[in-house]
Amino acid sequence: MPAPPCASCHAARAALRRPLSGQALCGACFCAAFEAEVLHTVLAGRLLPPGAVVAVGASGGKDSTVLAHVLRALAPRLGISLQLVAVDEGIGGYRDAALAAVRRQAARWELPLTVVAYEDLFGGWTMDAVARSTAGSGRSRSCCTFCGVLRRRALEEGARRVGATHIVTGHNADDMAETVLMNFLRGDAGRLARGGGLGSPGEGGALPRCRPLQFASQKEVVLYAHFRRLDYFSEECVYAPEAFRGHARDLLKRLEAARPSAVLDLVHSAERLALAPAARPPRPGACSRCGALASRALCQACALLDGLNRGRPRLAIGKGRRGLDEEATPGTPGDPARPPASKAVPTF
């Protein structure tokens, strides 16, 4: 049976049926609709003002690749300039290939690229070194705790180096729905109260962040990359399989099978969520060591690095779990091997 005509142009044959709306579109019309929806998200949310210098968190994966491609196409209409900022976490056999994809993208799209490395920023620590230090727990999920916190700090540092005024990341609707589920399952009222918006305004001197793909499903991100023939890196991080996010992802897939709108329902619910004032987190202060935003004496990054340098990474994870990155999980303090004493906690 031949494919129906495209519901938009009526000239070409439809190449896909949009997962949520059911609309049959050709590849060109789907890509145009996808870009228009991202443009609407940016304009309606007033995410990127004219003249903004935007640091795109570039990982080489499908989401950041699609985000960079779409924003590059929209940049003249938005009046913004783009800088690619990639983070080298120091994961052997994984990150090198991903960074190679980012470099190809930067060359093809003629966008400036800056790479910042954990090893340079965090006193010699790489994710492989962190994994060896936390190996006593017998689990890899704590690696995602460290990596999420440190990557956020590294992206901020890279954005400042290039003179950016805003940071954008490629989180899509599925990512956000998983985060809502994770925070709900943990009973993390603070993150539920503040995590549903399109980004953060940049309190305490931090750069404003936003997620222009927040309402785009993962399926459509993949379809856009396919029709635009984008070059991206698709392997999963070697430390990801045991992360708590994987359980939320499995649950979300089951929910979506029963209710196709489950992903966007969760995203919109998080937007509308209004918890009692008593449940909202206090206004953050400043880290006593590096000056970054912090709800305690030390920010997340300094607390984790402090635990690593003292040889007590599991204690660093367990002590303020709800204040850590969304991959954080309860930990049992262990006695991992002590890293070299020469690795000092850096001053940012």
UniProtKB/Swiss-Prot annotation:
Q: Where is this region: Disordered?
A: 316-348
Pfam families from the xrefs? ATP_bind_3, zn-ribbon_14
Q: Which Gene3D superfamilies match?
A: HUPs (3.40.50.620)
Keywords noted in UniProt: Cytoplasm, Phosphoprotein, RNA-binding, Transferase, tRNA processing, tRNA-binding
Q: Has UniProt tagged this entry with the keyword DNA-binding?
A: no
Please give the Gene Ontology molecular function terms for this protein.
nucleotidyltransferase activity; tRNA binding
| The keyword Iron belongs to this UniProt entry's keyword annotation | no
Give the GO biological process terms. protein urmylation; tRNA thio-modification; tRNA wobble position uridine thiolation; tRNA wobble uridine modification
Q: What does the record note on quaternary structure?
A: Component of a complex at least composed of URM1, CTU2/NCS2 and CTU1/ATPBD3. May form a heterodimer with CTU2/NCS2.
The record's family statement is: Belongs to the TtcA family. CTU1/NCS6/ATPBD3 subfamily.
The role this protein plays is: Plays a central role in 2-thiolation of mcm(5)S(2)U at tRNA wobble positions of tRNA(Lys), tRNA(Glu) and tRNA(Gln). Directly binds tRNAs and probably acts by catalyzing adenylation of tRNAs, an intermediate required for 2-thiolation. It is unclear whether it acts as a sulfurtransferase that transfers sulfur from thiocarboxylated URM1 onto the uridine of tRNAs at wobble position.
Q: Please state what the protein is called.
A: Cytoplasmic tRNA 2-thiolation protein 1
Q: Where does this protein come from, organism-wise?
A: Homo sapiens (Human)
Please spell out the taxonomic lineage of the organism that makes this protein: Eukaryota, Metazoa, Chordata, Craniata, Vertebrata
